[in-house]
Amino acid sequence: MTNYREIAWQGLWKNNPGLVQLLGLCPLLAVTATITNALGLGVATMLVLIGSNILVSLVRDYVPKEIRIPVFVMIIAALVTTVQLLINAYAYGLYLSLGIFLPLIVTNCIIIGRAEAFASRNNAFSAAFDGLMMGLGFTLVLAVLGATRELLGQGTLFDGADQLLGPWAKSLTIHVWQVDTPFLLAMLPPGAFIVMGLLIALKNVIDKKLKEHQPQVATEPSVTRARITKVS
């Protein structure tokens, strides 16, 4: 029986694609200058993850093991192309902001990794839930990273939200403080490396605290057995 709580825990925290597996670092560090770009890339990746997991699970019994990886990549590429065309049609500003990193979702190790490790061995519903949790965990990391960098670099949050949600979302921009000159370190990839390292360190500290508060399981002391031989 599938343990959906464990799947959710693995995707959102314990085995988070961004903080633990450190997959998809190239787009994660490159396009998270704002929370809008981060959410756009995260949602696109999550949709591809869910779709690819479902399709891989459905065809797993019909694809020979020798050619399964090329078939999985073709499925992923078709889904990425579909998502790319949809974003181009309905969120053109976001499409321009994400640039080359949108089609590069095809090569994201998160997607092919879940297809091989989970979707190809489980039913479609479990695979879809795994894709949702892994995609959501990745999106949360992107959002936190994007929000932190945008706040430090520009003093705003949700700047350019209209690119993702439409013209009505211009009012969502929050000016936290006035910045005369953008803090370039936070806006450039080196700043993303620093913030990402701090997020990983924070997760490790939280994991350590959680482990310390877990009840210790008492173990019985080991008993050494001695063989006694009768001496005549």
Curated annotation (Swiss-Prot):
It is an enzyme of class 7 (translocase). It is a multi-pass membrane protein. It holds the Pfam family Rnf-Nqr. One of its GO terms (biological process) is electron transport chain. It comes from the Bacteria. It is found in: Cell inner membrane. Keywords: Cell inner membrane, Cell membrane, Electron transport, Membrane, Translocase, Transmembrane, Transmembrane helix, Transport. Its main location: membrane. Its EC number is 7.-.-.-. HAMAP family: RsxE_RnfE. PANTHER family: ELECTRON TRANSPORT COMPLEX PROTEIN RNFE, ION-TRANSLOCATING OXIDOREDUCTASE COMPLEX SUBUNIT E. This is Ion-translocating oxidoreductase complex subunit E. It comes from Shewanella sp. (strain W3-18-1).
